[in-house]
Amino acid sequence: MCIRDSLLTGEDIDHSDRRENFQNTIFRLLELGALPIINENDTVATAEIKVGDNDTLGAVVACTVKADLLVLLSDIQGLYTADPRKDPGARLIPVVEEITADIEALAGGAGSGLGTGGMATKLRAARMVTGQGCDMIITNGDQPQLLYDIVEGKQVGTRFLGRRA
């Protein structure tokens, strides 16, 4: 599997010609069997054109290209019943069918040290994409093998099920 980083800003989403360009790039990467990794281009993103976090940016891109699946990487395996770094009894939640108030309450516990978002932004991203029928997985970015497992259809991390019309 080939992985390609795609650096975007808010302007790439807001302007139709730039949006079409990044959509075509993502579709071509997928045709070539590459896995697009979406990150905000912090070197050129100003406050006016900044999305703010990669979780939200990934969700916006997934909705724009009508993706079947969005994978968000974290420094933990997924969504837990409690913060796994503080509570040894915390259990991984393998599947979330609906983002309820109880699920949202779990987001306060385990933020990611890898970026600006934490679990709260990951749940907002999940709400955004699942509402468009796209599944989303949160898993550990420190374990690259997990991406292969996802491609092979194995249960990895926490999967949020998209609502199908």
Label each residue range with its predicted role.
Residues R4-A165:
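C-terminal catalytic "cap/lid" subdomain
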